[in-house]
């Protein structure tokens, strides 16, 4: 019995004026030799460690609040509180404190909280040691009472004495009786005085007075007094709102009357603090600290009582997931959980952990999966709020659930896919819900909060799951708005600029911008998973179609996606960009923007400036060789001239290097087979092909088996010779200005190889042959050649090989026809 009676929680007040839970234990009062006095000791019930050792100081002001709380300050800005499980235990310790200080245990405050200057004045005015004499509680004295209450607020000593006087004489209930009389008599002046009186009593900041004012008997009359603000022409109707508009709904009947009363009281007190009372000035901000604590401890108590009632929570979950539950009832159940989770935010971390683990064990995530798919907007919004609490609490818990779920369910009903679909289908024109859901998804796929243990790595497991089961749902709107059949139609028309697939609908553009933001996050934080996906789906080409959108913010999102990819300085990505000629839509956007100096212009130039500064050789060569003539007229920045300089410097270096190599070695360079990829890249490709059944980089369809590929030196020479003959036959015709015109009509399959199985042919670009039969410089890393049987074969060329090949200065340089 004594254990239960002395069971307490220890709280300290932090810098944000919020109570931090320091642990649960058992309190005792004993003489401590080291401290030379009676002290309060709290030992943890878990391991017996000392949670608190505090000497009962004769001059410290202790307060007893709500029958089960003792609060005091040990030093400046260091407040402590003991929250007792039982009133009897609180009374016992309170008596010990009062005994040490020589006080009557019936008082709620043992000392006046006074500073030195106040104490000096206090000693000079012995008459203040008496309690304040209150005027008789009658109508004619209301003005005098109001003046008294407002006058003491500036003095801590007088506030304390007034609070004691009000408590001892039962004065508040008498005032509230006068309020009823004034309302019956329409005594407006008296009602205005009562507003000042009740507001002033609240600012006394005394828990004992709050207990009276917020009791069932008094609280509505207190609210009534606060309706008659003299500054308002007409009184507010707070009581009408609380009694008629704000309805208390018991989704499951609450049998505990104390719990029900506590819920009512907390709602009404919160309403007083948030709605009725004016925002306190900088001089009044500490006047209501006890009111904040009152609400805080009430919420802690409510959550604890509900959490301990397993029958109640089990019934709530059962009805929430029952198909027979009607929509109205389900809406109420979801709203209850939303409020329940909101209250849980008042708990300390360890208590919040226990709270959410209780919900998880009862099945909160499967329940959310059901309600998030409902048509009711209110239900979905409330479910999203609950989901956000869970993700914030433990992303790992949510990830573990969805991976287990994937073993038993289809992709379309997985929780994460339900969340993605809600994001995509958000009917809000501003996509407020979609933005919230996107943030939650980003938290779930963020490797920074994923765990790595000796037995398993959450990161690799979850990302494998996400890219296999969820990524296609996320990118569906993007791929639908940049669909392949429309791209092919655009290619027939001759220019990607005639594209009709760019969404002009503002809401769709916003959604695509959100999806791109998430994909950009993936590029930054995921490795081979997103690389694999981008190359298999030719995703960057699809994204860059959005550069044509009339919504500049969407074009910038598309550009940002490409910028992040280039920022990785990954040659895999660089080869993909070069082979797909993916700078063309970016340069078209720059040229279309004309002389306008805007964010799009600056962002595009910054991308090319990054390539120049970082000296990304493969991209520099590709840009200069294919686009420089279109860009050389841009002189307001030196970026493009700088790229040309970089290109020429590299070309000179390679020429010098080549001239220093004996001719016999140069000729031998042509007798080697295509080099293998780096081990890790080759391993990655092989793994991917096994898992996905698709090739990643080669820009051709696999129309033949591996047996048809050239084997050994002889076949390699045959295919090389066939390629050179084809080059001579396909030389472009010279234009009147001496240049060459190329129209790039890359299909999706030309960029990503075997991904597009329906394509009958693949567009490939082969450089014109020089006079000596060797291939001219071509920065594309993969070249399409025809074998004797007519099959298309992908060979890997490297820039350094091509740099070493001989070429004549008269060899024409290919240049695309850019859309105007």
Curated annotation (Swiss-Prot):
Compositionally biased region (Basic and acidic residues): 701-711
Role noted for this protein: Regulatory subunit of serine/threonine-protein phosphatase 4 (PP4).
Compositionally biased region (Polar residues): 750-761
Pfam families: EVH1_PP4R3, PP4R3
Protein name per the record: Serine/threonine-protein phosphatase 4 regulatory subunit 3
Record domain WH1: where: 1-100
SUPFAM superfamilies: ARM repeat, PH domain-like
Low complexity: bias regions: 770-784
Top-level taxon of the source organism: Eukaryota
Biased composition regions of type Acidic residues, renumbered to the chain: 798-809
Organism per entry: Xenopus tropicalis (Western clawed frog)
Subunit description: Serine/threonine-protein phosphatase 4 (PP4) occurs in different assemblies of the catalytic and one or more regulatory subunits.
Gene name of this polypeptide: ppp4r3b
Upper classification of the organism: Eukaryota, Metazoa, Chordata, Craniata, Vertebrata
Family: Belongs to the SMEK family.
